[in-house]
Design a protein with these regions (language model features):
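Beta->alpha loop/short-helix hinge microenvironment recognizer with preference
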Residues: 1-395
Length: 395
């Protein structure tokens, strides 16, 4: 379903331009092996912000000019469509934020497993996200590390800066958790949450065992030596409170494999884009044939129905009561530098602030009705909507 969100003005070469120019050639060469979600992504991105999706007609009361704003496709692989999604999704997440420290962890898999992950995406991506979160929960449950249940938000990424295949999971973890009796909030001990070496080996073992139990045929096709390869993970302190969470969400949740800002140019045969070399901390450029660029991009389009953002621990939907209790325990903590306990009136105020949770997910976002845009001719703000038109009925 097309969401009636008007697109912003176009600036520079965009992914949609590349899809329109090289998409037909790519489809003719590789169409038989494409997933339905990849075909849908090409079609949606090509139609995004064109008359194909319909749009709105506005009139400027300053210069009396009329102009069109076409609808976005809202495909999650489209880099142009994430602005309105980001704003609305963040509003929905406000009720789930806990006023505490946060940690950022990353779980990667050895390159020898990449072929298996690519061939069984729904199964193995889901396993990787689940076992990474389970490993964090199990380590945090030990009293020598935390002795409590944290909140975990897991995000799947499959790319590196050059659009290569690099599946890994980012985890945002609360710097503390609620104890088993539900009576206390146990904070993390400074900048330490769990030992990274133990976390890596635990994720590897849990992934191997889960795959063997749940998909024995897939497990049998993987050489035994692969499981002796080292898995790499890290976990570090990320920040405190809402700012840390919002920064994390903007950096990791609302990301596509490439943004329009990174696309530098396109000619009749090639695409040039920039990428960040994380080792040298410098920006590099790469020039690829257009079809190869689309091949790299499309390998990061996820199967239809796969949820790349998942919640575990305190943030799992089944833990609403515990999460609300954790929020209350954190709010009721005596402010730093004071010795006065909270009074009954303070408690009532806090209870009135208890957030109302929703079950809305990224896939369920509703319409985002924008305000009337500025006039592209004179820059005036006195614009008004004349009408909305369905697919292909615009000029």
């Amino acid at each position: 379903m097309v969401d009636p969100v008007a697109c912003p003005p176009k600036a520079g070469v965009e992914l949609a331009d590349i899809v329109r120019q090289f998409g037909p050639k790519y489809t003719s060469q590789y169409g038989q092996g494409m997933m339905p979600s990849q075909k849908r992504a090409l079609a949606d991105i090509a139609a995004c912000c064109t008359r194909e999706l319909g749009g709105r007609l506005y009139r400027c009361d300053d210069c009396h000019d009329s102009f069109w704003r076409y609808h976005c496709c809202r495909n999650r692989a489209c880099p142009k469509c994430h602005g309105s999604q980001t704003r609305q999704w963040l509003e929905e997440r406000q009720a789930e934020l806990l006023p505490c420290d946060y940690f950022h962890a990353v779980a990667t898999v050895p390159s020898e497993l990449h072929a298996a992950l690519r061939s069984h995406q729904k199964l193995m991506y889901g396993l990787l996200m689940r076992v990474a979160a389970e490993a964090v929960k199990e380590l945090c449950a030990k009293k020598k590390h935390l002795g409590a249940l944290p909140g975990i938000l897991a995000v799947l990424h499959t790319w590196n800066g050059q659009l290569g295949y690099h599946p890994h999971v980012h985890l945002l973890i609360t710097g503390g958790g609620i104890t088993a009796d539900g009576q206390h909030w146990e904070p993390a001990r400074g900048a330490f949450l769990v030992p990274v070496a133990v976390l890596s080996s635990k994720i590897a073992a849990k992934f191997r065992d889960a795959l063997k139990d749940e998909a024995p045929a897939v497990f049998a096709d993987i050489p035994a030596g692969v499981w002796r390869r080292e898995w790499v993970s890290f976990c570090k302190h990320y920040g405190h409170g809402n700012d840390a969470v919002l920064n994390y969400l903007s950096r990791y949740v609302f990301r596509t494999a490439i943004s329009n800002a990174r696309i530098l140019s396109m000619d009749q045969t090639h695409v040039t884009f920039r990428w960040k070399d994380r080792h040298a901390e410098t920006w590099q450029t790469e020039r690829l044939p257009g079809v190869e660029f689309l091949r790299r991009f499309l390998q990061h389009v996820l199967p239809r129905g796969f949820h790349k953002v998942r919640y575990y621990g305190l943030w799992h939907p089944s833990k609403r009561t515990e999460s609300n209790r954790a929020w209350l325990l954190l709010i009721l903590q005596t402010p730093a530098g004071t010795t006065e306990p909270l009074k009954l009136t303070d408690l009532l105020d806090v209870l009135g602030q208890l957030p109302q949770r929703t079950d809305q997910s990224l896939a369920d976002l509703g319409d985002d009705e924008p305000e009337c845009p500025r006039c592209p001719r004179c820059g005036g703000t006195r614009t008004r909507l004349l009408g909305e038109y369905s697919r292909s009925s615009g000029p």
